[in-house]
Amino acid sequence: MGSNYIVIEGLEGAGKTTARDVVVETLEQLGIRNMIFTREPGGTQLAEKLRSLVLDIRSVGDEVITDKAEVLMFYAARVQLVETVIKPALAQGIWVIGDRHDLSTQAYQGGGRGIDQTMLATLRDAVLGDFRPDLTLYLDVTPEVGLKRARARGDLDRIEQESFDFFNRTRARYLELAAQDSRIRTIDATQPLDAVMRDIRATVTKWVQEQAA
């Protein structure tokens, strides 16, 4: 079996925290217990400070964060996490379960913000090389459903306050990218919770068994 990096992706309110719990439970049932958890942006001292800058609407006062500055902060946080936490863990045979990775940037900034996708791909390759998650679970939910759930939780960060149009563009890009990459498995997160959990368990179990074959 190769490296074991599983990432959970999706719009706000898609249910990533619940999905992570199901992934962990499924892996443990398969005898896998040596794992760590990451989130993006974040996961290291530096990356957490960058997270605060890019997501907290109060962090820069009245200054507007430009789209390109936003992208670069996401990548600065990401490469710090990958190089100092994720890669060392994978090298030791530890499983890594991530809350978001590069697919978020390709969808949110490439789709939602409309940043040139060729530029994003070039930046990704320069920063990450060929490093990719081994399995990505994309929890697909409409912005109407996802944002209703997110807003019920309380305070929204800077990106969560974007328009429905922004999230519709983001979702469209997620779906486009998922259709192009066999390592990305789409889960219908608009289903009842039991059905979503069932699909996650089945997807993870099948993938682990395929890797072990």
Swiss-Prot record:
CDD domains for the chain: TMPK (cd01672)
Keywords in alphabetical order: ATP-binding, Kinase, Nucleotide biosynthesis, Nucleotide-binding, Transferase
Source species, domain of life: Bacteria
Binding-site residues, ATP: 10-17
Catalytic activity: dTMP + ATP = dTDP + ADP
Pfam families attached to this UniProt entry: Thymidylate_kin
GO BP term, example: dTTP biosynthetic process
EC number, as in UniProt: 2.7.4.9
MF annotations from Gene Ontology: ATP binding; dTMP kinase activity
Gene3D superfamilies: P-loop containing nucleotide triphosphate hydrolases (3.40.50.300)
SUPFAM superfamilies xrefs: P-loop containing nucleoside triphosphate hydrolases
Function: Phosphorylation of dTMP to form dTDP in both de novo and salvage pathways of dTTP synthesis.
Family: Belongs to the thymidylate kinase family.
NCBIfam families (UniProt xref): DTMP_kinase
Name under which the protein is recorded: Thymidylate kinase
Protein source organism: Salmonella paratyphi B (strain ATCC BAA-1250 / SPB7)
Taxonomic lineage: Bacteria, Pseudomonadati, Pseudomonadota, Gammaproteobacteria, Enterobacterales
Gene from which the chain derives: tmk
